[in-house]
Swiss-Prot record:
One of its GO terms (biological process) is tyrosyl-tRNA aminoacylation. Its EC number is 6.1.1.1. Residues 346-409 form the S4 RNA-binding domain. L-tyrosine binds at residues 39, 176, 180. GO terms for cellular component: cytosol. The lineage of its organism: Bacteria, Pseudomonadati, Pseudomonadota, Alphaproteobacteria, Sphingomonadales. It comes from Novosphingobium aromaticivorans (strain ATCC 700278 / DSM 12444 / CCUG 56034 / CIP 105152 / NBRC 16084 / F199). This is Tyrosine--tRNA ligase.
Length: 409
């Protein structure tokens, strides 16, 4: 492992955040001698970010922990176009009202990760709509457009991939990388920003911003990207068969959020503890070394630590208590998904769909046929099975890790 002089790059390296850097030696030297403002952009494509964005949010947290200044850039302007990087087709355009509502909803998450204020290392949040919405087309083309080579833009993997597949890339989308580059230059002027960070898919956009800032202002700025994060089975972070694992409390119950982390593959436990918690590295090494059924204790620690960070102490405690009641004591935790039944009975298929364990009746039937459905711990293999609902709560399970409650309405 490379030895760095700055606490910032040492921290990022030790915890596995670094994929690529521009001029690592110069960035290391700068970070060792002064406070660096650094930013990451988040486009408001939904009312909540999901777990797939957590590496970037944690990267801003690490920046602040190392004594530097995080800048959260909300893409109120670029969100009107949509980032085409490595997408097979154009994003659906959102109205201005939807974008504004999404920005307002997303903002609250960052307060759990970062300290905001007016101090030299306090985080700030800005919106690129503040400058992009004011651009005039002809002056922008003359001042900024001259610094971009279309030939080079076509060579970036994110663009080349679409063209090689003969998939349409609109002029609107093609302009996204220019606007993102302009963001870096604008933040350099407004906030003395010297660093842009992002996922590995943003490398081309980051390099464009570095070059634009150098050409227009003669300022040296830097870029860092994180590795593409997938689970051990090759799945993308933040998505499950049931949908996205949202960060906002109103988008996903704390129990489901906690359970996502508790279900982590054994092979991912150490990596996720380093990336998504503040636990000391020696403690992570101890947890990562656990084998057999003991690794489950490390998964509970992971679930508790991440849920505490994202949802708060009480949510983490409640989720763990629900898990203990459900799995250890055979009881029913209070935070499990619940379905109120108005009739005296309900079919197993309808119960599975109603509890969110299957997206459709067909999927529920396949789950039953495959032996994945249980009622109060007993397997159900008949898709026509009816569950009698009385004053007693009934546990319905999908596989070993998903549990819900049926209650009389």
């Amino acid at each position: 492992m490379t030895e760095y002089a700055s606490s910032l790059l040492r921290l990022l390296s030790e915890r596995g955040y670094i994929h690529q850097m521009t001029d690592a030696d110069a960035l290391d030297a700068l970070a060792a001698k002064q406070v660096i403002p650094g930013y990451i952009g988040f486009d408001p494509t939904a009312p909540s970010l999901h777990v797939g964005s957590m590496v970037q949010i944690m990267l801003l947290r690490r920046l602040q922990q190392a004594g530097h200044k995080p800048i959260v850039l909300m893409g109120g302007g670029t969100g009107k176009i949509g980032d085409p990087s490595f997408k097979d087709e154009a994003r659906k355009l959102m109205t201005n009202d939807v974008i504004a509502a999404n920005v307002a909803s997303i903002k609250t998450v960052f307060e759990r990760f970062l300290t905001f204020g007016d101090g030299p290392t306090d985080a700030v949040m800005v919106d690129n709509a503040d400058w992009l919405d004011r651009l005039e087309y002809i002056p922008f083309l003359r001042e900024v457009g001259q610094h971009f080579s279309v030939n080079r833009m076509l060579s970036f993997d994110s663009v080349k991939q679409r063209l090689d597949r003969e998939q349409s890339l609109s002029f609107l989308e093609f302009n996204y990388m220019i606007l993102q580059a302009y963001d870096f230059r604008e933040l350099s002027q407004r906030h003395a920003c010297r660093l842009q960070m992002g996922g590995s898919d943003q490398w081309g956009n980051i390099v464009n911003g570095i070059e634009l800032t150098r050409r227009m202002d003669g300022v040296e700025v830097f870029g860092v990207t994180t590795p593409l994060l997938t689970t051990a089975d090759g799945s993308k972070m933040g998505k499950t068969a049931a949908g996205a694992v949202w960060l906002n409390e109103d988008a996903l119950p704390a129990w489901d959020f906690w359970q996502y982390w508790r279900n982590t593959d054994d092979r991912d436990v150490g990596k996720f503890l380093r990336l998504f918690t503040d636990l000391p590295l020696d403690e992570i090494a101890r947890l990562e070394a656990l084998e057999g059924s003991e690794i489950n204790a490390a998964k509970v620690v992971l679930a508790n630590e991440v849920t505490r960070l994202v949802r708060g102490e009480e949510a983490a405690k409640a989720a763990e208590a629900t898990a203990a009641a459900t799995f250890a004591g055979g009881g029913l935790g209070q935070d499990l998904p619940t379905l109120s039944v108005g009739e005296s009975e309900i079919g197993i298929v309808d119960a599975l769909v109603g509890l969110g364990f299957a997206a459709s009746r067909g999927e529920a039937k396949r789950l039953v046929a495959g032996g994945g459905a249980r009622v109060d711990g007993e397997p159900v293999t008949d898709e026509g099975f009816r569950i009698l609902v009385n004053d007693k709560e009934i546990r319905v399970s999908s596989g070993k890790k998903k549990h819900g409650i049926l209650r009389k309405a």
